[in-house]
């Protein structure tokens, strides 16, 4: 029987704590998978995927970012921090990795980031190289540098006009709102997430997914996108760490396949070599909520199992520094 535990741990942002979930398998875990969720959602949406992995022997964990899910206690949805929000969010990912790693120091440890969570995972690989056994980047991409710079500038201007907790219809339309244009005529504003109408409706009905991100979060995320695109920063990664890419062929965040292929090339240029890419025809942004999610789970499980030590955890375990 899978055991699910809710807990909190201190955030890098003073005075805040992060709500987290852990899914423990029935027997001794073979490895750990830490989920890093996307924008305007929460870790509870990954329950089905986490249970699948736990059924196959993995301990799964993940936290609600600042301004997301049950981490929010003051109504500040979609808000990281007044300043340095991206770094704080990345440090919270790192804190959970250290916490879980301390409990299981010899287990292989994997990060799995979706969408904004994939950008945070890429940030993690730069800031703390060699401290995970592997990473999975799902729903990732890379917008052209001039577009990212423009987005950061507009968000910063709106931040000065509205304050860091303000919400700008202009910024939302230019960013997330643009994704649905590719799927006209659309049934809902979120058709770009999945081909499965029931999954789209579940997202729209989820009260923890209804807030719009603040202008400061967009500003911080644009800064994060600039960081993870810089050659000098990519060179800081440990090239021996395997990275798996999962993306829908119809995912606008991944540029309909082109953007995620660009990210693979960026990793190759940084010296990384173990970089399998799975592009799923017809699939949109949220692969774990897509019609072919069982296919995605199977590919993910195969990749994880192929990167486990042949006879259980290595004596030295995974670096916990």
Question: Which residues does each PLM region occupy?
Answer:
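N-terminal cap/lid segment of alpha/beta-hydrolase-fold proteins
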Residues: 1-27
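Active-site glycine-rich loops that stabilize anionic/oxyanionic intermediates
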Residues: 33, 37-41, 115-116, 249-250
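Conserved alpha/beta-hydrolase
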Residues: 50-76
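Alpha/beta-hydrolase active-site loop
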Residues: 81-102
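Alpha/beta-hydrolase fold nucleophile elbow
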Residues: 104-115
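Alpha/beta-hydrolase-fold enzymes
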Residues: 121-208
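Catalytic active-site module of serine/aspartate enzymes centered on a nucleophile-bearing elbow/loop
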Residues: 270, 274-321
């Amino acid at each position: 029987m899978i055991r699910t535990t809710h807990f909190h741990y201190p955030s890098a942002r003073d005075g805040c704590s992060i709500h987290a979930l852990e899914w423990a398998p029935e027997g001794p875990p073979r490895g750990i998978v830490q989920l890093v969720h996307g924008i305007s959602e929460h870790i509870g949406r990954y329950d089905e995927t986490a249970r699948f992995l736990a059924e196959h022997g993995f301990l799964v964990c993940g936290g609600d970012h600042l301004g997301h899910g049950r981490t929010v206690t003051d109504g500040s949805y979609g808000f990281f921090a007044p300043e340095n929000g991206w770094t704080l969010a990345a440090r919270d990912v790192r804190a959970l990795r250290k916490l879980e790693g301390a409990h299981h120091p010899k287990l292989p440890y994997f990060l799995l980031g979706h969408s904004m969570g994939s950008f945070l995972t890429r940030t993690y690989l730069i800031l703390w190289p060699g401290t995970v056994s592997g990473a999975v980047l799902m729903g990732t991409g890379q917008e052209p540098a001039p577009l990212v710079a423009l987005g950061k500038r507009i968000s910063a201007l709106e931040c000065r006009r509205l304050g860091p907790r303000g919400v700008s219809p202009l910024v939302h339309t230019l960013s997330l709102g643009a994704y649905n244009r590719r799927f006209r005529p659309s049934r809902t504003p979120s058709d770009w997430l999945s081909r499965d109408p029931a999954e789209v409706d579940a997202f729209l009905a989820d009260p923890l997914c209804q807030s719009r991100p603040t202008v400061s979060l967009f500003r911080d995320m644009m800064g994060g996108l600039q960081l993870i695109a810089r050659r000098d920063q990519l060179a800081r990664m440990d090239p021996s760490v395997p990275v798996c890419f999962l993306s829908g062929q119809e995912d606008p965040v991944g540029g309909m396949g082109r953007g995620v292929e660009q990210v693979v090339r960026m990793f190759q240029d940084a010296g990384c070599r173990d970089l399998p890419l799975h592009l799923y025809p017809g699939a949109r942004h949220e692969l774990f909520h897509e019609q072919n999610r069982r296919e995605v789970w199977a590919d993910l499980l195969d990749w994880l199992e192929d990167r486990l030590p042949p006879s259980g955890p290595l004596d030295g375990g995974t670096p916990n520094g």
